[in-house]
């Protein structure tokens, strides 16, 4: 790293020297402390130290600060992160890599930004930066029209033939993106067994493989290995949380919710996000605890400023399952989660659409549901189609009803199919051309599917977590 001291003025150097002389190391920003705090989920302490070092000109600390902003997934903070990466990229190859990775998953990015991302990632890869092939592969997979000259599978095969360590994981990502993961479990297992010691995201992939197959002995051995690696500091709490989510996922083979709960309770005191994961696990498996346990988990998560805790608490008041239904409290908690949690917009939209606050608020419902739909919540398209077809609180709009009914087909549910057929019947023939044009425009606004964007953002996060500390 280029020494930031060379770029500081004499008065600044003098002030820094005086501070060092008067206080020694006590109270001074500490990058190692920031790294450890971030690894353990204490983003406030990490941000405090990174920010102070970043203000002194340390490019690695600037990158660390931007990483925290990226982790929030808050649109406003993502813009700040992009600006921070750009500023640091003038002297830091790591920042160049981060900028490329962020542009690769940036919502509503332009074709020029995607091309810039490719250039930055290729440059970073040539400079030996890790974590570049996964977002590069995602670029090619998500935006084939921008890169018509690139065949993603051929490119990944070339990387694997050249022996690049990340290439195997790029292949796994391709299977996930194309929906063929279940057809390649043997290959995923082989790739991740070889890469496990170097890339801990493979704990998640192997847990998925073993749970899908129902291989309980292999799963138990993997969990024991994970616990040992975490105790030794080789695997962070976030990875343990990710594995626990697989164990508690009822859509993947036969879940092991009790082991998931044990893992999460082990790491939650030092990794507050896991309190919310515990609450969601209890929501899915009520036999694991009672309402008091649920509130304990959620209050711990809220105390650590976790938006997902606000989302889940709002959902509880919305549904009236664990606590008495209360639309006012639901709205209050859901609003606190909207900056980072797309689902919060969906539930708010439903509150306004269904009149849970005493009357229907059609425009508020449309605004919230459209935000949710464009963020990847397929059920929001279905709700919008219902709103425009039923005309509850507003006049029926058969054109908009048809458009959102067509978009809701992505959820592949019988209800969506039935609604789409009904809307096609009700749409006047002379308005079909207008409806198709509106559908095309809405699809263009959404660009790459939000599900893929979410997957890409997750890939960015997972790859970054696998790197060495800044």
Swiss-Prot record:
Cell compartments where the protein resides: Cell outer membrane
InterPro entries to which the protein is assigned, alphabetical: Alginate_biosynth_AlgK, Sel1-like, Sel1_AlgK, TPR-like_helical_dom_sf
Domain of life: Bacteria
Lipidation residue positions, type N-palmitoyl cysteine: 25
Lipidation (S-diacylglycerol cysteine): 25
GO annotations of cellular component type: cell outer membrane
Keywords associated with the record: Alginate biosynthesis, Cell outer membrane, Lipoprotein, Membrane, Palmitate, Signal
SMART domains xrefs: SEL1
Main location: membrane
Keyword check for Lipoprotein: yes
Topological category with respect to the lipid bilayer: Lipid-anchor
UniProt function note: May be involved in the polymerization of mannuronate to alginate.
Protein name in UniProt: Alginate biosynthesis protein AlgK
Name of the gene: algK
